[in-house]
UniProtKB/Swiss-Prot annotation:
Localization (cell): Cytoplasm
Superkingdom: Bacteria
Protein family membership: Belongs to the cytidylate kinase family. Type 1 subfamily.
Gene3D superfamilies: P-loop containing nucleotide triphosphate hydrolases
Protein name per the record: Cytidylate kinase
GO CC list: cytosol
Keyword Cytoplasm set for record: yes
Length: 230
């Protein structure tokens, strides 16, 4: 890990726009991108593939320690290609089932510890955009700049519905909303690394903001923090 490489963390709940903004920032700055949520989704999918119970912390932790996952440069539709045990799972990890399973395995303290070093290894020159739920509070507490994106549960459910519809999934928006509210509660109230803004993070409510507006706010803040740190 390069301690000198700057890190910008982007945390927040599911559907707040973290993934989109993170990809745009990484492309704009020419930095590395860490989608930490994808790591937990891959772990959840691996558990499902290997018939490991999602409630079994010991087995999930063992699986996490030996997780065979690679992140490759993708295409415009999927900027990051995710490979699990030699298989392309980029689309498979984006299902709602996988998302819910990821939230369950992410609640285990030993699982989070097992994946901590792997996440920190993404910090390489010229810099890193780290997208997740505890990037600014736990994984990179001394990050150069920290952002926290949020939005109403209703807006996030609508975004998720549109996203899944575009990918050809048949989904129910009422069920999506209920699952988002349930996941928010689970993520925000877990005893280890709960979903909360870092004290020094810039909080942006994206409910009524377009992508360009959020990106401009983020870039202005990042440039300000980087120039101050230098």
């Amino acid at each position: 890990m390069s301690e000198r490489a700057p890190v910008v963390t982007i945390d927040g709940p599911s559907g707040a726009g973290k993934g989109t903004i993170s990809q745009l920032l990484a492309k704009h700055l020419g930095w590395q991108l860490l989608d930490s949520g994808a790591i937990y989704r891959v772990l959840a999918l691996a558990a499902i593939h290997h018939d490991v119970e999602l409630e079994n912390e010991e087995s999930i932790t063992l699986l996490a320690a030996h997780l065979d996952v690679k992140f490759l440069t993708g295409n415009e539709k999927d900027p990051v290609q995710v490979i699990l045990e030699g298989e392309d799972v980029t689309t498979a990890i984006r299902t709602q089932e996988c998302s819910n399973a990821a939230s369950k395995v992410a609640a285990f303290p030993r699982v989070r510890e097992a994946l901590l070093r792997r996440q920190r290894a993404f910090r390489t020159a010229p810099g890193l955009i780290a997208d997740g739920r505890d990037m600014g509070t736990v994984v990179f507490p001394t990050a150069s700049a920290k952002l926290y994106l949020t939005a109403s549960a209703e807006e996030r459910a609508q975004r998720r519905y549109n996203q899944l519809q575009d990918k050809g999934f048949d989904v129910n928006i009422e069920r999506l909303l209920a699952e988002i509210i349930e996941r928010d509660d689970r993520d925000m109230n877990r005893p280890v690394a709960p979903l909360v803004p870092a004290e020094d993070a810039l909080v942006i409510d994206t409910s009524d903001k377009g992508i360009d507006e959020v990106l401009e706010l983020a870039l202005n803040y990042i440039n300000q923090k980087l120039s101050h740190n230098n």
